[in-house]
């Protein structure tokens, strides 16, 4: 199983990726990471008890009002019919503005209680297994 290392100001998280269940999403995420796309980006949307969202290229500048609106310049298809499509604590899921419009933005789930409505709507493509505190 592939793993990803997500480095933040507060430490490093290790996530296992659901490459068998969501191959297109994992391939895209890994490619962006290897290409350095995510380097220096911030989690631009953090809502306690809900999610921490990152992956927007505009988030490098904390004063850029476009943070949360950017992407890689293309979109990918949702893979919400796969196994493991359950938004529980630690899950990595693709953010989007509508079905099949995601590209680079993703979020990490804080709490299952507030994310049940995301099941079947956003592709879950991994889960943090270390360092989520």
Model-derived features: where do they sit?
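Cyclophilin-like peptidyl-prolyl cis-trans isomerases
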Residues: 1-133
């Amino acid at each position: 199983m592939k793993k990803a290392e997500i480095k933040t100001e507060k430490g490093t998280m290790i996530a296992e990726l659901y490459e068998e269940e969501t191959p297109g999403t994992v391939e895209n995420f890994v490619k962006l990471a290897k290409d350095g796309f995510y380097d220096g980006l911030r989690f631009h949307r953090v809502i306690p008890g809900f999610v921490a969202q990152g992956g927007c290229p505009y988030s490098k500048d904390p004063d850029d009002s476009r943070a949360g609106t950017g992407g890689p310049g293309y979109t990918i298809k949702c893979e919400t019919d796969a196994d493991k499509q359950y938004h529980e604590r630690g899950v990595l899921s693709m953010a989007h503005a509508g079905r099949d419009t995601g590209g680079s933005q993703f979020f990490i789930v804080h709490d299952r209680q507030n994310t049940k409505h995301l099941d079947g709507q956003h592709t879950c493509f991994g889960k943090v297994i270390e360092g989520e505190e």
